[in-house]
From Swiss-Prot:
This is Translation initiation factor IF-1. Residues 1-72 form the S1-like domain. It comes from Rhizobium etli (strain ATCC 51251 / DSM 11541 / JCM 21823 / NBRC 15573 / CFN 42). InterPro entries: NA-bd_OB-fold, RNA-binding_domain_S1_IF1, TIF_IF1. Keywords: Cytoplasm, Initiation factor, Protein biosynthesis, RNA-binding, rRNA-binding. It is found in: Cytoplasm. One of the essential components for the initiation of protein synthesis. Stabilizes the binding of IF-2 and IF-3 on the 30S subunit to which N-formylmethionyl-tRNA(fMet) subsequently binds. Helps modulate mRNA selection, yielding the 30S pre-initiation complex (PIC). Upon addition of the 50S ribosomal subunit IF-1, IF-2 and IF-3 are released leaving the mature 70S translation initiation complex. Belongs to the IF-1 family. GO terms for molecular function: ribosome binding; rRNA binding; translation initiation factor activity. Pfam families: eIF-1a.
Length: 72
């Protein structure tokens, strides 16, 4: 199965939601719902409100995403 095209955007976590999901405001002023990637869960990387993150999205649904990196 070929890897599909993904879009990556930096953003800031604005709100923590239930079930390890977050509301993220992207740099282009869009707000999306994102969850943490499996490697971040596995390595127990905490994401809090106000953190700068990198969000990965598919071109099919631009309202949901996956947090792949938390900037230091």
């Amino acid at each position: 199965m070929p890897k599909e095209e993904v879009l990556e955007f930096p953003g800031i976590v604005t709100e923590l939601l239930p079930n390890a999901t977050f509301r993220v405001k992207l740099e282009n002023e869009h707000e999306i719902i994102a969850h943490t990637a499996g490697r971040m869960r596995k390595n127990r990387i905490r994401v809090l409100a106000g953190d700068k993150v990198l969000v990965e999205m598919t071109p099919y649904d631009l309202t949901k995403g996956r947090i792949t990196y938390r900037f230091k």
